[in-house]
Amino acid sequence: MRVGFWRLRKVMQKLNINPTVTLNARVCETYPSVVKACIDSGWELNAHSYDQVPMHKLDDERAVIDKSMDIIEKFSGKRPRGWFGPGLTQTFDTLDYLSEAGVEYIGDWVLDDEPVTIETRHKPVVALPYNFEIHDIVMMALQNHPSDEWHGRALDHFDVLYAESAERPKFMAIACHPYLSGVPHRISHVERTFAEILSHDGVVAWDGSKILDWYLTEGRMRDAA
């Protein structure tokens, strides 16, 4: 966090990428300078619970969701629109609690390459495309691949989606964590990967809110037609 975040930030700024920052609310208390840098950069903050305790192990899941949303809103001035559960964990009640707390989209359901509307007892929530394979924890910490796997796997994944996008829009999520993607021996692979993807015609880098807004105004209408 103290070093890797700033390396990633330089890459994002160099390539004009405004990512979604999936934020444990506790970071607002422990590393406020990092959260402020995200806000100053114009990056979206979404909630990642208070800390990394799995949702099914919380004594009061609803209270932790509300606490997390409130802390980030108080610090940033904006209530998060999105939510990622720690380790993508949920219970059967999570979506209902999230909808009640004002969450509009989640990234916990790795089920499609396009947004999907999910009904809850409150208001619908949109599941945005997430990927647990183009993900630095999986590639580097769990599967123990060399650093260049970052570039090769991401481009292989992108090439298929790019070809399919000739028929309908596709979305590709890439997960970066400062302590993995922000280290010296990986950061060049991260930068090269994003640069090559963005060099293709018709490709844009959007945060979660932009994807959500597109889906709510155009995507669902396209599917209904």
Which residues make up each language-model segment?
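Binuclear metal-dependent hydrolase catalytic cores centered on His/Asp/Glu-rich metal-binding motifs
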Residues: 132-134, 138-153, 157
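A structural motif
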Residues: 120-138
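Catalytic alpha-helical scaffold of carbohydrate-active enzymes acting on polysaccharides/glycoconjugates
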Residues: 1-126, 151-174, 180-225
